[in-house]
Amino acid sequence: MEKRLGFHYFQDYDHYQARDLELWVPELASLQASWLVLKAPTAAAIPEEFITGLIQAGIQPILHFDFQVNSDVRPEDLRVLLSSYANWGVKHVIFFDRPNAKSAWTNGSWSQGDLVERFLDRYLPFVRLAEQNGLIPVFPPLEPGGDYWDLSFLKKVLQLVQQRRSFDFSVNFHMAVSSQTFDHPLDWGAGGQSRWKSPRPYSKVDLGEEDHIGFNTWHWYADLVSEVLNITPKFFLFYYGMARIAGNKLDADNSFEQMVDVALALSGESRNTNTLPDNVLGCCFWLLSAAESDPNGKTSYFDANGKPKEAGIPAYKQKIEQSTKQKQEYAVSSRLAEWIYPIDHYLLLPSYDWGIPENTLDRIRPIIRDARPTIGFSVIEATNARKVTVWNENAAFSEHDIQLLREAGCMVEEQLINSIGITV
């Protein structure tokens, strides 16, 4: 899927100016990136020019409002912002960040009871507001494992939504999911619960078993959603290319080019065992860039001035340029062929003063059915075709006629016919 590549943008609000757009759009376009996760402030909108500039370049922003779950921000505070973003062409928004981690909650609120219920009570009003404005709410990424076991957290969320029936959470369900590898190989945990035993929370994985804490977390989440809601969610893989965010550690075992290959491999058309299905919409690398003072800069793919830090990026750009050039050359040659040969395929029939024998019409039916050629009786007209099938019945066309077609550049297929049958 060509449009899967994406990035997480700067983790501050200081890089939404015109100069930033001018710097990063060409870089993102040269990588054929289609998604950009933007950290969205609650007090003011990201400038319209920045949002529309991305969209016009074919890059769809995913706005992430990552304020703490029980902060003072109310849905009403975001009403004007969400309306504006929708009018500017934004489609996807995320509220909160890793709500199964203590850091997502204000001090003292984590230990209070009914954590998942309290999360859902906060979350659903934001979801409703987003949908009222025509936006797609994306369920926030959970921390694999986490301070509240992520599989338990997600399952309870899904069960509560189903029990309440106050909101159809299952319609067009999108999720952001961690794709951190945690130093496991890319196929760790692949297949989800259909292949592996459900892991015991915070316990060492049994010998011969694998768990969900790795690149394939989305497999396990998909199983849970299918089990509870009987639907297939759409996924955005976040923190793509990372071993673990907590330690600012890229996955050294998988290069940028390898991760790109995994992201772009088509389902069912690749030998890669990590091929992603079509419901994985985007793979967002962590991190496009960061300020020099930001610790996240250790794992960014570009420095703050747009210079690649990852060795594989220039090679990948060159690969894209070559592929684009080949596609353009093919398109030009195809249009040139159409201009040189106005007719693609011509069936040249002999002409008699009294008409065409009925058995000739019967014989040419398979050609007409399979090739749908232009049908005619003129050698001169046939010279305008890329391919000519000559129905040479009883030597109606001379060798001179055949040579004339070949000299015109036509690909000639001659059918030699006599009154008894056909010999090719």
Describe the function of each predicted region.
Residues M1-A43, Q60, E329-T374:
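Boundary/entry segment of secreted carbohydrate-active catalytic domains
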Residues L5-R19, W24-E27, G53, G247-W339, ...:
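Aromatic-rich peripheral "rim/lid" segments of glycoside hydrolase catalytic domains that contact
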Residues F7-L21, S34-E49, F67-D77, N100-K102, ...:
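Acidic-and-aromatic substrate-binding clefts and catalytic sites of carbohydrate-active enzymes
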Residues G58, D121, G214-P277:
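Catalytic-core region of carbohydrate-active enzymes that cleave or remodel glycosidic bonds
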Residues P41-A43, E49-L151, A382, A396, ...:
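Substrate-binding cleft of extracellular glycoside hydrolase catalytic domains
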